From Swiss-Prot:
Protein family according to the UniProt entry: Belongs to the DadA oxidoreductase family.
One example GO MF annotation: D-amino-acid dehydrogenase activity
HAMAP family: DadA
Superkingdom of the organism of origin: Bacteria
Organism: Xanthomonas campestris pv. campestris (strain B100)
Pfam families: DAO
The enzyme's E.C. designation: 1.4.99.-
GO cellular component: cytoplasm; plasma membrane
Name the record gives this protein: D-amino acid dehydrogenase
Length: 429
C-alpha cells in the first residue's frame, strides 16, 4: 500500500514510522527543509502522559475574563476577522462544563497512556536518544484553591491507573532541589513519575533518519496546494503544480489542516493556539530544574535538557500570527527568575513561537474521514509530542485493517460531523 503523508512534524513523522513498520510504502511531504521545524521545533519539551488535560475546563470562562486584565495571563484572545475563530471559541465554551471536561479528559488520558507505552517500546527497540529524561513532572500549586481543584484530575488518573504523588510544600524539594533557591511559596504539588522530557525537534529529526533507513521517502521544500477528489475518494494531491497520487493519504499539517479540507466540504474545528518558549543555556546546574516543573498559575513548563532549560507555555487565540510578542518573553523570564533564579543565561536565550493545532474539546482528531482513503492525524493542541506515538501507531493499525489496541471512541472527526455523515466501508489492506 502506497501512503502519502502531508506534514513532517512530530505527528507526521511518527505516523510514517509506524506505517513503514507495517510494510507500507510511505512518502512524506513538507514545505520545510527538514522534519520538525514548525510547531515541533521548540515546544515545552514535555511528554506529559499524566498531565493530560483539555484547556476547556470548568471555571475557564470566568478566568478568561479576569485574564484579559492581567499582564502575565496564561490565556489571551485577540479577535480576528476569521469567523472560524468565533465558532471555535463558542464550541470551546460549550466544553467547559464538568460533564464535558470529564469525558474529554478521559479520552485524552486513554490516548496518552497508550502513547507512553508506544514510546517506551520505540526507545527500547531503536535506542533513540533526544536529550530525554524519565524523572516525571512536578505540577506546582501556588494556592490552596488550585490544589483543591486538582482533585477531579486525580480521580481520572486513579481511574486509568496513572501513578501520582501529592506533595506537601516541604516535600517538593525532594524532586526539584533547585526550587529551594527561589522565593516562591507553594501550597503543594502533584508529582507524576511516569512523565518524561526531551527535545521534540531532536526526537522528530532522529526518528525521520530511522524512518528513512526503513524506506520512507521524505520530500522537503515542497508546497502542498490542494486535495483532488472524485467519487468519495481522494484522487491525488497538487504539490508544486503537479499531481501526486497514492493509495491512501494522511493529513498531518497541524493548524493548517483545516484549510486544506474546506474544498472537500469538511469543516474541521482545529484552530491555532499560539505558544511561546525560551531556550536558555544553563550556567548553574545546581539551580536548574531536574526534570519538568509546571507552574499551574501561569501554565508555564520549565524543562531540563542536557545543557539547556526550555521554558514554554501560554496560549494566544490570535489566528495564524507568528510575530514574537515581547510581553510574552517577559512572562517567561519572570517565571524563570521566580522559580530558578540564576540557573540560566537569559541574555543568550532563544525566543520562539509556534502554532499548536487545537480542537475545542482538547481531544485530537485521529482516524478515518467520509473520504474512503483519507485519514487525519491532527488537533493535538499542547500535547502533540505526548500523543504522537500512540496516534501514529493507532492510525497505522486502522489503515492496515487491524483492530487498534485502544478504544477508539471519540477520537476521529465524526464526533464533529452531522449525523448524516457516514463512515466509509473499508477492507483490510
Amino acid at each position: 500500500m502506497r501512503v502519502l503523508i502531508l506534514g513532517s512534524g512530530v505527528i507526521g513523522t511518527t505516523t510514517a514510522w509506524y506505517l513503514a513498520q507495517s510494510g507500507c510504502e510511505v512518502t512524506v511531504v513538507d514545505r520545510q527543509p527538514a522534519s520538525g521545524l514548525e510547531t515541533s521545533y521548540a515546544n515545552a519539551g514535555q511528554l506529559s502522559f499524566g498531565y493530560t488535560s483539555p484547556w476547556a475546563a470548568p471555571g475557564v470562562p470566568g478566568k478568561a475574563v479576569k485574564w484579559l486584565f492581567e499582564q502575565h495571563a496564561p490565556l489571551s484572545i485577540r479577535p480576528t476577522r476569521d469567523l472560524r475563530q468565533l465558532a471555535w471559541l463558542s464550541q470551546m465554551l460549550r466544553n467547559c462544563t464538568a460533564e464535558r471536561y470529564a469525558v474529554n479528559k478521559a479520552r485524552m488520558v486513554r490516548l496518552s497512556d497508550y502513547s507512553r507505552d508506544c514510546l517506551n517500546e520505540l526507545r527500547a527497540s531503536t535506542g533513540l536518544e533526544f536529550e530525554g529524561r524519565q524523572l516525571g513532572t512536578t505540577q506546582l500549586f501556588r494556592t490552596q484553591q488550585q490544589l483543591d481543584a486538582a482533585a477531579q484530575d486525580i480521580e481520572v488518573l486513579a481511574q486509568y491507573g496513572v501513578p501520582y504523588e501529592l506533595l506537601s510544600p516541604a516535600q517538593i524539594a525532594q524532586y526539584e532541589p533547585g526550587l529551594a533557591g527561589g522565593g516562591a511559596q507553594m501550597a503543594g504539588a502533584l508529582h507524576l513519575p511516569e512523565d518524561q522530557t526531551g527535545d521534540c525537534r531532536l526526537f522528530t529529526q532522529r526518528l525521520a533518519d530511522l524512518a528513512t533507513q526503513a524506506g520512507v521517502q521524505f520530500r522537503y521544500g515542497q508546497q502542498i496546494e490542494r486535495l483532488e477528489h472524485a467519487g468519495g475518494e481522494i484522487t491525488g494531491v497538487q504539490i508544486d503544480g503537479r499531481l501526486v497520487t497514492a493509495d491512501r493519504y494522511v493529513l498531518a499539517l497541524g493548524s493548517y489542516s483545516a484549510d486544506l479540507l474546506l474544498s472537500l466540504g469538511l469543516h474541521l474545528p482545529v484552530y491555532p493556539l499560539k505558544g511561546y518558549s525560551l531556550t536558555i543555556p544553563i550556567v548553574d546546574a545546581q539551580r536548574a530544574p531536574t526534570s519538568t516543573v509546571l507552574d499551574e498559575s501561569y501554565k508555564i513548563a520549565l524543562t531540563r535538557f542536557d545543557e539547556r532549560i526550555r521554558v514554554g507555555g501560554m496560549a494566544e487565540v490570535a489566528g495564524f500570527d507568528l510575530s514574537l510578542n515581547p510581553r510574552r518573553r517577559a512572562t517567561l523570564e519572570m517565571v524563570v527568575n521566580d522559580l530558578f533564579p540564576g540557573a540560566g543565561d537569559l541574555a543568550q536565550a532563544e525566543f520562539w513561537t509556534g502554532l499548536r493545532p487545537a480542537t475545542p474539546d482538547g481531544t485530537p482528531v485521529v482516524g478515518a474521514t467520509p473520504y474512503a482513503n483519507l485519514f487525519l492525524n491532527t488537533g493535538h493542541g499542547t500535547l502533540g509530542w505526548t500523543m504522537a506515538c500512540g496516534s501514529g501507531r493507532y492510525l497505522a493499525d486502522l489503515m492496515q485493517g487491524r483492530t487498534p489496541e485502544i478504544d477508539t471512541e471519540g477520537l476521529d472527526v465524526f464526533r464533529y460531523l452531522s449525523t448524516r455523515s457516514t463512515r466509509p466501508h473499508r477492507e483490510a489492506a
